[in-house]
Amino acid sequence: MTLVALCTDSSSLISPAAAAELGVEVVPIPVTLDHEKFDGTTDGFYARMRQGAVATTSVPSPGAFVEMYERAQGGGATSVLSIHLDRRISGVSESAALAARETTIPVRVVSLPTVSYGVGLCVRAACAALRGGATVSTAAVEAERVATTLDNVFVARSAPGGRVPADDEWTILRFAAGEATGLSTHATVEEATAIMGRRILRGRPGLVAVGHAGAELEAAADGLAHDLVEAVAAVERYRVTPSVGAHTGPDSFGAFWWPASR
């Protein structure tokens, strides 16, 4: 019997509850604040950043992936599908590929042209394919296909180290082709929220996922979701946790969207 284990890393923003439900193994992205390992809560992390702490992340070691792959093998898996963010901005998939060469279980490593919760959505699509009887290759292709249907828009007000900048401007960004590009800059978060909503609706989305980093931005995310909920089939919510928030800073919120049919 063929049993495929599905793996990713914590930058996919798959919550522990969702990972357990999907049966997905998640390798943590190491996070530090002021050069010390951080293991606290998401709210505590952003509170420290607002106080001036410098946040950094590092790539999980190949050994961390080897441990995960071998654990999957010990649980009865005969192969592994390991799905990660864009290799153009992170070495995570390269570390996973190095680990794959050190294990006896076959591992397919996929680097997607998306980041953050976009990766999580693709992991979910691969999981659905596997549960439907797909092979590793077919599930990998499905994850890659879904990645091409996704679009995104977000605000990330951060200075070096993810600290909060001194200015009050809110620049709307979009991640594509391995980089984040500024679309427009606004004087208030309310104005940025309205413009983001209009851009999303112009994309004729079927489904939308809205997320936020610091608790202070939850209201902005709520406003964005409210602007969209009557025009789309569903609006999901997610939290930007430290593995991504170390780069965006606490003043960040945004959305991914895709056709209802995907």
Predicted region positions:
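Local beta-strand N-terminus motif with an aromatic residue
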Residues: 3-4, 77
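N-terminal glycine-rich anion-binding loop in soluble enzyme alpha/beta folds
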Residues: 4-64
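Short N-terminal secondary-structure initiator segments
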Residues: 37-65, 117-139, 206
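Mixed-charge interfacial surface used for oligomerization/domain docking
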Residues: 3, 11-25, 30-32, 92-108, ...
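Glycine-rich phosphate- or other oxyanion-binding loops that anchor nucleotides, phosphorylated ligands
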Residues: 50-98, 140
